[in-house]
């Protein structure tokens, strides 16, 4: 907890992920005194734990790489997949102002971004979709440049073997290490990068941490303090205007006397969703649900949403999340990406039947796990838990839950029952609680599809997105491979998430709204504390961070404009 001599700023930003840091950076560069308060002992939030991708069509990074796109195509695509659940003005504000935001950030921080070639939009065949992708990611960053603030950077979610630093575009190639020369070449490149960094005394970080680190340096240069272990407890209202926040030391009891920090111009909530609030998840989201399956930052307990709701803020899309099929490993759930796309695997429900294209975008995959429209409906989810079924050949060829190809499944995973292993499909079915006859029939039917290269039931491998994490050396379909080389494995799959989606309704400037559409003066929101501009869908890699940064930017600009700071 900090005890400041100055208890008043122009702008108070709650949360230190991408949304909060960009908002603070803009406010400071517009001449507004700004502070960031962060509940956790580290800064960066869920952004730092993520892949760090940013989905903003027609930005300067893409243009420099010669990526052929148009604003019209992006508009057609995003409006088409989001539908009418989100105000079209908000979608347009994101598309129109996102590139401007990114240029500002690149100018005022040491952040370096690059295109992720081939990382397809999640619905590339939709009108305006791009099979070649619109996602960019941060280049590896030397965290030593942070100085004393290096220690405060949020740790990475998962440890990479041998402590190598990887980018998103590395991961897809490393998964092909045993299957394609490109995998070998990429592993050599990653190894050389790591050795060079060690030889030159650098502490390279990648993915989300390589996004947050440069943003923190931008705040250092702008003189913006980031106060850690400072828990937001409530909003301060004066004369009908949100004019500050109450905070306490995160180490103190919740009953401790809070400290008031006044905000002369506005408060920007950027403190994440409610993925770690069990009561809120049970209240708003379909069963089964738990805080144990999320990979979001542990400090995200809905504090901002609850405080805004007390002031009459409207909430929207609270039933949804940035879902993804997840292996609920004890203590650290594994958000499954390539595991579902690699050939030689299927996902079945407790009836032993397939129920979706296993390789589809992860939010939609979990909607299918729950069943109904966008995962909503009466009663508990229809296909939870599910089981990812694969064989030894799959295990020998591909990365699985952070294990290298051929690496043995840890005994603690098997002992927990999250992973089961057997010499026959019938035995595997018994261990997983599945009907043996149905599982055997499902695998036999799927194997016929694998031989023909056509998934007649769910069209797996037909989309460019499916194929991105597939195996190009596997013919005739990079996503379909027979399951028939014992021993067999089953991995329990549950609807995990990167964070919750729902939150405070906002306008094009990030201002918090009431149910009647009126504005809560002085209060702004960006990131997962706010209802998403993406609605129930997910357009492509970085479709969470891109809007978080953009609406943090727009919120700070609006405050500055209202204050006459240009």
UniProtKB/Swiss-Prot annotation:
EC number: 1.3.99.4
InterPro entries: FAD-dep_OxRdtase_2_FAD-bd (IPR003953), FAD-oxidoreductase_2 (IPR050315), FAD/NAD-bd_sf (IPR036188), Succ_DH/fumarate_Rdtase_cat_sf (IPR027477)
Residues annotated to bind FAD: 10-39
Principal EC category: oxidoreductase
One GO MF term attached to the UniProt entry: steroid dehydrogenase activity, acting on the CH-CH group of donors
Entry superkingdom: Bacteria
Catalytic activity: a 3-oxosteroid + A = a 3-oxo-Delta(1)-steroid + AH2; a 3-oxo-Delta(4)-steroid + A = a 3-oxo-Delta(1,4)-steroid + AH2
Protein's GO biological process: lipid catabolic process; steroid biosynthetic process
Role summary: Involved in the degradation of cholesterol. Is also involved in the formation of 3-keto-1,4-diene-steroid from 3-keto-4-ene-steroid.
NCBIfam families: PRK07843.1
Protein name per the record: 3-oxosteroid 1-dehydrogenase
Annotated source species: Mycobacterium tuberculosis (strain CDC 1551 / Oshkosh)
């Amino acid at each position: 907890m900090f005890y400041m001599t100055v208890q008043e700023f122009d702008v108070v930003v709650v949360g230190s992920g991408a949304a909060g840091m960009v908002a603070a950076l803009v406010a400071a560069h517009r001449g507004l005194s700004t502070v960031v308060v962060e509940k956790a002992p580290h800064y960066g939030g869920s952004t730092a734990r993520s892949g760090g991708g940013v989905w903003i069509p027609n930005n300067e990074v893409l243009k420099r790489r010669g990526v052929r796109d148009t604003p019209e195509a992006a508009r057609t695509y995003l409006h088409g997949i989001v539908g009418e659940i989100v105000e079209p003005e908000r979608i347009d504000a994101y598309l129109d102002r996102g590139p401007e935001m990114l240029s500002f950030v690149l100018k005022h921080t040491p952040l370096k971004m690059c295109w992720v070639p081939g990382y397809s939009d999640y619905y590339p065949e939709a009108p305006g979709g791009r099979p070649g992708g619109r996602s960019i990611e941060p280049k590896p960053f030397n965290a030593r440049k942070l100085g004393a603030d290096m220690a405060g950077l949020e740790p990475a979610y998962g440890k990479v073997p041998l402590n190598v630093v990887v980018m998103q575009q590395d991961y897809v190639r490393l998964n092909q290490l045993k299957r394609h020369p490109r995998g070998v070449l990429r592993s050599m490149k990653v190894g050389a990068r790591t050795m060079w960094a060690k030889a030159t005394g650098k502490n390279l970080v990648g993915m989300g941490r390589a996004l947050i680190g440069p943003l923190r340096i931008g705040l250092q240069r702008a003189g913006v303090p980031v106060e850690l272990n400072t828990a937001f407890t409530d909003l301060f209202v004066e004369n009908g205007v949100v004019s500050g926040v109450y905070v306490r030391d995160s180490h103190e009891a919740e009953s401790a006397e809070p400290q008031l920090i006044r905000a002369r111009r506005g408060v920007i909530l950027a403190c994440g969703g409610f993925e770690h609030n069990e009561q809120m998840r049970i209240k708003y989201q379909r069963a089964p649900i738990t805080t144990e399956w999320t990979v979001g930052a542990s400090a995200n307990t809905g504090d901002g949403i609850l405080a805004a709701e007390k002031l009459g803020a409207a909430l929207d899309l609270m039933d949804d999340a940035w879902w993804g099929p997840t292996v609920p490993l004890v203590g650290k759930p594994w958000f499954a990406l390539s595991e579902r796309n690699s050939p030689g695997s299927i996902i079945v429900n407790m009836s032993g039947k397939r129920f979706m294209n296993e390789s589809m975008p992860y939010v939609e995959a979990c909607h299918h796990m729950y069943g109904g429209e966008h995962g909503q409906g009466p009663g508990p989810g229809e296909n939870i838990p599910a089981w990812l079924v694969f064989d030894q050949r799959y295990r020998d060829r591909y990365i699985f839950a952070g294990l290298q190809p051929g690496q043995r499944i840890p005994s603690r995973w098997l002992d927990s029952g999250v992973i089961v292993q057997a010499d026959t499909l019938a035995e595997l079915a018994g261990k997983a609680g599945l009907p043996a006859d149905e599982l055997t029939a499902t695998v036999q039917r799927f194997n016929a599809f694998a031989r023909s290269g056509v998934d007649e039931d769910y069209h797996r491998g037909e989309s460019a997105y499916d194929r991105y994490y597939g195996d190009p050396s596997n013919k005739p379909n990079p996503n379909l491979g027979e399951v028939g080389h014992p021993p067999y494995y089953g991995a329990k799959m549950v609807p995990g998430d990167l964070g919750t989606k729902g939150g405070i309704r906002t306008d094009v400037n990030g201002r918090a709204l009431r149910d009647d559409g009126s504005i809560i003066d002085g209060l702004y929101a960006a990131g997962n504390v706010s209802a998403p501009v993406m609605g129930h869908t997910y357009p492509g890699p970085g479709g969470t961070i891109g809007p978080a940064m953009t609406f943090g930017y727009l919120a700070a600009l609006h405050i500055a404009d209202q204050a006459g700071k240009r």
